Structures are given as structure tokens and as C-alpha cells.
A protein has these predicted regions:
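PLD/PLD-like phosphodiesterase catalytic module centered on the HKD motif
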Residues: 1-152
Length: 152
């Protein structure tokens, strides 16, 4: 049901009848439907075949807030560094870093890897989040998020 929070832009959709019956939300997505009324966000725990738990965050465009600073950092109870594609276009404006007394959401502008690779978020289309501790006396927080939403 997490997919129902996305307004998907699907080029082609092949939905076999057995999938449609087993997962009815796929038929709704095929018809261009998605969640437009509260709740406009959803957090679910997904479990891998190996038993590892993953938190999945979903939101609709109607929510009108930043996924990372308004949902992810609060749920993780951690400050986060967010790297997303930094291309502004039309009415999409890159969001600034958000610093407050409990959790900060910082926009990562550059990535420097140990094997002499360096690139900026302007050139990179990936999206990821790394949780961190603002106090050097606290151990790092063990969260890494992989996403598909820009901070715009």
C-alpha cells in the first residue's frame, strides 16, 4: 500500500490478472489513482527475506512538506545529511538546510570518495541520507537511507 502514496508517472503498465487480484492497489496505480486525502504520509517497516527490518517512508505531493526534514529526521530522531539532485527548474526551488535544537537536515553539496572521485550534487541524480551525531561524544547513528525524492 506504500505505492498508493506516490503519484506515479508510468510510461507503460503490464498488470497480469493474478497480480491485480493479489495486490489491488496496483490496479489503482494503473488507472492513475493515488492517495489524495489524509493521512498524506506513511511509515511502514518492511522485512527482507533474511529478516532485516527496513523503514519505508512515503508521502503524497499534497502533503506539501519536505520528506527529509519534516518526516525522516523526526522518525529517526537524528540529524541527517541529505544528498539529492540540485537542479532547479520552473517552480521547483532547492530547499535550504534546516538547523534546529533537536535535529538538523543538512544539504550535502559535494561528495568526496576515498578513491579520488569527487562530484557535486548538481551532477549527481542519486538521493541518499546519512544520519549523524552533532556531538563528537556520541557514537554515530546507524542509519542510511536511499530515496527517490529531491529536496525541492
Amino acid at each position: 500500500n506504500q505505492l498508493f502514496f506516490y503519484n506515479t508517472f508510468t510510461y507503460q503498465f503490464n498488470l497480469p490478472p493474478f497480480f491485480s487480484a493479489a495486490v489491488p492497489v496496483l490496479n489503482q496505480l494503473k488507472n492513475g489513482e493515488y492517495n489524495k486525502s489524509p493521512p498524506l504520509t506513511s511509515i511502514r517497516v518492511l522485512k527482507s527475506l533474511a529478516g532485516q527490518n527496513f523503514k519505508h517512508f512515503a508521502k503524497t505531493g499534497e502533503w506539501g512538506k519536505d520528506l527529509y526534514s519534516d518526516l525522516v529526521s523526526g522518525e529517526l530522531k537524528s540529524s541527517i545529511k541529505v544528498e539529492t539532485w540540485n537542479h532547479q527548474s520552473g517552480d521547483e526551488v532547492n530547499l535550504p538546510s534546516v538547523c534546529n535544537s533537536t535535529q538538523s537536515t543538512l544539504s550535502a553539496k559535494y561528495i568526496r570518495l576515498p578513491f579520488s572521485v569527487y562530484y557535486s550534487s548538481y551532477e549527481d541524480h542519486s538521493k541518499f541520507v546519512v544520519a549523524y551525531s552533532e556531538r563528537s561524544s556520541q557514537p554515530p547513528i546507524p542509519y542510511v537511507c536511499i530515496g527517490d525524492i529531491n529536496r525541492q
